[in-house]
Amino acid sequence: MLYLLPNLLGDTEGHSHVLPSSVDRAVSGLDQLIAESEKAGRKFLKRFAFDPPKTFRDIPIHLLNEHTDLKQRKELLDQVVQGQKWGLVSDCGMPCLADPGEEFVLLAREHGVEVKAFVGPSSILLSLVLSGLGGQRFTFRGYMPKEKTLRIKELKAMEMLSRKERCVYLFIETPYRNDALLQELIEHLEEKTWLCAATDLTLATESVITKKVQTWRKIKRPFLDKRPTVFLLRG
């Protein structure tokens, strides 16, 4: 059995307001955990209670991240196929959305492993519904290109397609580059385009601002650097 376990979107005291009790029950019964890093996996486990003498330190953690090649994923899957209760967790939010877990789940499906997902916070879905830009048609673009010329070209292409297809585009950036990306969006998008910045979702510092670009150019901009943010546009 492979459990897809939701994680928090940031540091909060307690988790009952975000994660359902079914996640507590699933985690308390785990035999193994797959995580992006030992530190993040152990931090996740530490939030939950286990029946004594078992503690969060007793759960073995196996790494699955951008450095895990196909051979290593298959070797990990060989262990999952043998049985026990395995959990898969992302550093934050739902696994398999913009993280390496998606390819592993496909492998698990191909080999007949039973997979169960649990409800939890997703910055993609939360930003979409909070933005007000509509959820009928949308595309998650993921991370933007690192090279500025390519990035601006991609932004203009998304804006054009959004207007043509009447859909919303969602995308993200490495948090320390958020302010620079917001500046580029305001400079290069057309003034009638809708732009949303959804920041620190589910946290006490949550901020969601949706305005046309022409209004963004006039207001005081929020400080977004090092704060997890999802950007959305609708042409």
Regions found by a protein language model. Give the residues of each.
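Alpha-helix capping/helix-boundary segments
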Residues: 39-41, 93, 123, 177
